[in-house]
């Protein structure tokens, strides 16, 4: 099955909005053994939209189109699909009633421009939208079937999960087995080099491999077709885990903060944080996880030296001798947070996020991290590259990964 994505909206081409829908759908389709062949972005222009619909449906078996389904003048999807088909738009009464009910619920009156969301090309199948006001629709255009969905991410993804992906699975019949491991701080090129023997062995078996780099994470994915797909995918998984060992922090939908919270909860232990350059980012990552209250005792942003001394008990002499950005101070922050909270674990982070403040001895990007636990304190030094936000984010994730390793 040939699949293409067509996204419409001036905002996507002016940089005002980043298209997150397409990568999300590509990822889901990959798990079904399908790679999207092309993605097309088109402005809110009738001629360009009609041309793009004709072009994509002339090449692909399935075109998933997003955007242009709303009530405003620049929402043109239904109109342009109808024009390509040479059919009129028709009013869909069930959708009108749902719109009226939705507006009544919010104490508003349905206006003519909002009724526009319930007009579809003759012959189209309407796809109800329980996440928003604009339904989707699908219709055959030439050799390809086009599925038109609203561009709002929660609506787009809900409709894909509920309608698009099940229909794709039904058309495919046999779905390949898929695997995904997530690596921490492994460059994509290194991962690819390490995976070469596995990929070479599977080269003639229809197995697809792919990588996604979202530093400091790199994801390695594979899909395996055939009647014994599950067993072969499992063997690939075992080889991948053997190659990367502790650099693998998760699989599938695992996220690093979730794993750390789960490990702490399983042990009945708690953690306290002494953050400086990350400004509470580690606490933010942990508290984004439901159930974090069971494992997080304390989070202190000790930015000034006085705060390090007074709140977490970092000795003034230590700060004077080594400077705030140093391994001894990172250790003292971790141990001070642990001691102050009476927690099993403490994390300390101190560094220079930039863009200023660096020296030849301690350039921007220098970060010291420490984890204090029942068996002592471990510390590492890192030299991160990137802007201020990237340095801070890398340090926060590194701290979680160090804690993950300590909890193994």
Swiss-Prot record:
Looking up CDD domains in the UniProt record yields: cinA
TM spans (from-to): none
SUPFAM superfamilies xref list = CinA-like, Molybdenum cofactor biosynthesis proteins
Disulfide pairs here are: none
Query: Pfam families given for it?
Result: CinA, MoCF_biosynth
Q: Which family does it belong to?
A: Belongs to the CinA family.
PANTHER family found in the cross-reference section: NICOTINAMIDE-NUCLEOTIDE AMIDOHYDROLASE PNCC (PTHR13939), NMN AMIDOHYDROLASE-LIKE PROTEIN YFAY (PTHR13939:SF0)
Q: What is this protein called?
A: CinA-like protein
Organism field: Anaeromyxobacter dehalogenans (strain 2CP-C)
């Amino acid at each position: 099955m040939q699949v293409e994505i067509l996204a419409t909206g001036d905002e996507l081409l002016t940089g005002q909005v980043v298209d997150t829908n397409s990568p999300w759908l590509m990822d889901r389709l990959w798990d079904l053994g399908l790679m999207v062949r092309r993605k097309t972005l088109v402005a809110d222009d009738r001629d360009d939209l009609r041309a793009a619909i004709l072009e994509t449906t002339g090449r692909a078996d399935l075109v998933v189109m997003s955007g242009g389904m709303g009530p405003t003048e620049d929402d043109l999807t239904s109109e342009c699909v109808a024009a390509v088909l040479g059919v009129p738009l028709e009013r869909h009464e069930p959708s009108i009633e749902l719109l009226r009910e939705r507006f009544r619920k919010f104490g508003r009156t349905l206006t003519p421009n909002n009724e526009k969301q319930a007009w579809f090309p003759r012959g189209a199948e309407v796809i109800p939208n329980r996440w928003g006001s604009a339904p989707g629709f699908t219709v055959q255009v030439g050799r390809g079937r086009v599925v038109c969905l609203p561009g709002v991410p929660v609506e787009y993804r809900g409709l894909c999960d509920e309608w698009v992906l099940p229909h794709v699975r039904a058309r495919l019949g046999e779905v390949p087995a898929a695997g995904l491991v997530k690596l921490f701080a492994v460059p994509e090129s290194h991962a690819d080099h390490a995976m070469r023997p596995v990929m070479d062995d599977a080269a003639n078996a229809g197995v697809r491999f792919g990588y996604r780099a979202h530093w400091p994470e790199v994801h390695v994915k594979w899909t395996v077709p055939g009647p014994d797909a599950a067993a072969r995918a499992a063997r690939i998984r075992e080889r991948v885990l053997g190659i990367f060992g502790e650099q693998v922090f998760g699989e599938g939908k695992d996220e690093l903060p979730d794993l750390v919270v789960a490990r702490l909860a399983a042990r009945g232990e708690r953690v306290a944080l002494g953050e400086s350059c990350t400004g509470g980012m580690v606490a933010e990552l942990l508290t984004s996880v439901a159930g974090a209250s069971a494992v997080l005792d304390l989070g202190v942003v000790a930015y000034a030296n006085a705060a390090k001394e007074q709140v977490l008990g970092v000795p003034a002499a230590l700060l004077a001798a080594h400077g705030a950005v140093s391994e001894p101070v990172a250790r003292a922050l971790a141990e001070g947070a642990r001691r102050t909270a009476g927690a099993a674990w403490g994390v300390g982070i101190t560094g220079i996020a930039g863009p200023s403040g660096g020296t030849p001895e301690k350039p921007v990007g220098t970060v010291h991290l420490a984890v204090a636990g029942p068996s002592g304190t471990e510390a590492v030094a890192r030299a991160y590259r990137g802007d201020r936000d990237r340095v801070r984010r890398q340090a926060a994730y590194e701290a979680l990964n160090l804690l993950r390793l300590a909890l193994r």
